[in-house]
A protein has these predicted regions:
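Acidic, proline/glycine-enriched N-terminal capping motif
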Residues: 1-93, 101-103, 332
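Internal amphipathic helical hairpin motif
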Residues: 68-102, 165-195
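Conserved, structured C-terminal
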Residues: 1-35, 112-464
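Generic hydrophobic, aliphatic-rich segments that mediate packing or membrane embedding
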Residues: 61, 69-74, 89-91, 102-107, ...
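Short, charge-rich binding segments
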Residues: 84-86, 95-101, 106-112, 134, ...
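Short amphipathic beta-strand starts and helix->beta connectors
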Residues: 43-49, 95-105, 191-200, 381-384
């Protein structure tokens, strides 16, 4: 029997967790760009030392949200405040379930009156589309699917980020003039090679930079102009391998599992979702195993989004989050892994037997949603969610969510690397044995220059 929707699919399997852990899908892919332009070490070096161009035109989906009720719907779904969300502003948009667990996060752009754009992974876009289509709102939505799910090779928009210490020098050269002053997550319009571009003030590398986007027809001239402008400043183009690792330095967790697999209030949503969509195909990987899929859910505080939760409006999940607000929360941290333990784990690749799970470079992520067990003296204290190597710091790092008593920098923990029982049936998993790797709880973001950019008096708080 073919399942018509996600709810039917979940009812057809003995275990939701087993279904997700054995899904035949690897990590998120980054189509449209080479794996490497020079090499991933050089490209990582660029975002800390010169400047880089991230080509984001292919791997993220976009949802246009337009109409008189667009703001009303978005405010109803997001934990964020919308009191000051004027045209030409953007924000990290975080919707939750009625039980207060995160569905995902995307960037929300306010492009014009009654016109918005959501950019990121599918779960949030699906959630917004469902409510737009079923809630009786006076509005429209239109999905522009990511390139991996297209056959025409075209998108509605190109999207380029110029980041790093010399990012604004490159922007000035491409514009032919000094860029206008712009606050963090604010938008402006500018002209490059005779075409109008929209620009968002952003800073993934801890330095002020711009994210530029516009009609797909302008992809080539804008891209060429940025590359030419960057030659003097050592601009690196970033390929898919290095791009997948930049979250380790910036401290953003890309991979919360959408918390929609349980709950009677969400049954109609699961019946709306297709069986073969993102939620029905997503893969979980790692050493953390629980029979209850809700143990894989995150709250906003777990992901470092507690400061975004504002109780100044009515939104789905508000009552649950109000109950949680004063509780002890888990904390997002970086784990700096023990060099010798990592080296010993990698060295098992030269053994005929008892090999560890392969650690790829620079990103060791092998599923869409990584969950590795983190312990102290054998007791579970959290999960690791993103794993990889930064050449800039000469360190293997993970982004983790840790119980408050053990989240203080300097705390020694142990990460269990690899899956139990020799591994699941995911195509990215080979037979292996689990290995313990020691780590030290460290700040997030791990890189000092990125961490300093979040200070109250940093460039993020000023028009620069």
């Amino acid at each position: 029997m073919t399942q018509r929707n996600l709810e039917e699919l979940l009812r057809s399997v003995p275990s939701t967790v087993d279904m997700l852990r054995n899904a035949q899908v690897g990590p998120n892919v980054y189509p449209g760009v080479p794996a490497e332009y020079t090499n991933w070490r050089d490209e990582q070096w660029g975002w800390q030392n010169t400047c880089v161009l991230y080509n984001q035109s292919f791997h993220m989906a976009e949802l246009a949200v337009e109409g008189p009720d667009a703001m009303t719907l978005l405010s109803r779904l997001g934990v964020n405040t919308f009191g000051n969300f004027d045209v030409d502003r953007a924000k990290q948009f975080v919707p939750c379930t009625p039980d207060g667990y995160v569905i995902g996060d995307v960037i929300l752009f306010h492009l014009a009156e009654e016109e918005f754009n959501l950019v990121g992974r599918a779960p949030v876009l699906n959630w917004v589309t469902y409510h737009a289509q079923t809630g009786g709102y006076d509005m429209q939505v239109a999905l522009d699917q990511r390139s991996a799910l297209r056959t025409d090779g075209r998108r509605k928009h190109y999207r380029f980020q110029v980041q790093g210490p010399h990012a604004m020098d490159v922007i000035a050269r491409a514009l032919g003039t000094q860029p206008p002053e712009l606050r963090f997550f604010n938008l402006t319009s500018a002209e490059i090679e005779g075409v109008t571009v929209r620009a968002l003030r952003h800073g993934m590398a801890g330095q002020p930079g711009w994210e530029l986007f516009g009609p797909w027809e302008d992809y080539e001239p804008v891209h060429a102009a940025l590359v030419a402008a960057g030659q003097e400043f050592g601009l690196r183009l970033v390929g898919g391998r290095a791009y997948s690792s930049n979250a380790l330095e910036s401290g953003w967790i890309p991979s919360p599992l959408p918390a929609i697999y349980t709950g009677d209030e969400l049954r109609s949503y699961r019946e709306w979702l297709p069986a073969n969509g993102y939620e029905g195909s997503a893969s979980i990987g790692g050493s953390f195993v629980s029979a209850d899929v809700e143990d894989y859910y995150f709250t906003p505080w777990d992901l470092g989004y507690g400061h975004l939760v504002k109780f100044d409006h009515d939104f789905i999940g508000r009552e649950a989050l109000e109950r949680m607000a004063d509780d002890e929360h888990r904390h997002k941290v970086t784990l700096a892994l023990h060099d010798d333990d990592v080296a010993d784990t990698i060295a098992t690749m030269f053994h005929k037997t008892d090999r560890a799970k392969f650690i790829d470079w620079p990103s060791a992520v092998y599923s869409m949603h990584p969950f590795d067990l983190v312990t102290v003296n054998g007791d579970t204290v959290g999960v690791s969610t993103w794993f990889g190597y930064t050449s800039n710091e000469a360190k293997m790092l993970t982004l983790a969510v840790i119980n408050e008593p053990h989240a203080k920098p300097g705390t020694e923990v142990t990460l269990l690397w690899g899956e139990e029982g020799g591994g699941t049936s995911k195509p990215t998993v080979e037979p292996h044995v689990q290995r313990e790797i020691r780590g030290v709880v460290s700040p997030v973001p791990y890189v000092e220059v990125v961490r300093q950019s979040y200070a109250p008096d940093s460039w993020r708080s000023a028009a620069v």
